[in-house]
Amino acid sequence: MAKNKDDIKYATAQAKLSEDEAIRVSYKHGTPLEGGKIAESEPVELFSSAQRIEKGKEQSAASGDQTQIQRDIKDIKGTRTDDSPR
């Protein structure tokens, strides 16, 4: 651990030789890097719920004009549940 400000090195990666491997593995913030990527990483789908949204849109389009009719009813004064002015 650093004792003073001079001991801190910013934006530097350290390399060490792994005992069980004959390859160099570099570490950045304690995470091992191999070939510029995080070691043994798997692809992660960040927006997995986006597929469900797209499927929902397709299903609503297949149901016809029923959703448009429901929207029109909500626009009639007095039929909205919150009765807030538009």
Curated annotation (Swiss-Prot):
This is SEED MATURATION PROTEIN 1. The keyword Chaperone applies. Keywords: Chaperone, Developmental protein, Stress response. Boiling-stable protein. The keyword Cytoplasm does not apply. Belongs to the LEA type 3 family. Disruption phenotype: Increased seed germination rate after high temperature fluctuation due to a reduced seed dormancy; fail to enter secondary dormancy after 3 days at 40 degrees Celsius. GO terms for biological process: maintenance of seed dormancy; response to heat; seed dormancy process. Residues 52-86 are annotated as: Disordered. It comes from Arabidopsis thaliana. Residues 60-70 have a biased composition (Polar residues). Protein chaperone involved in seed maturation and dormancy maintenance after high temperature fluctuation (e.g. secondary dormancy after 3 days at 40 degrees Celsius), probably by protecting heat labile proteins required for secondary dormancy (e.g. G6PDH, HOP3, SR45, ECP63, SCL33, RPL32B, ChlADR1, MSBP1, MBF1B, At3g01690, At1g15280, At1g15290, At2g31410, At1g11630, At1g65090, EMB2279, EMB1674 and RPL35C). The lineage of its organism: Eukaryota, Viridiplantae, Streptophyta, Embryophyta, Tracheophyta. GO terms for molecular function: protein folding chaperone. Residues 71-86 have a biased composition (Basic and acidic residues).
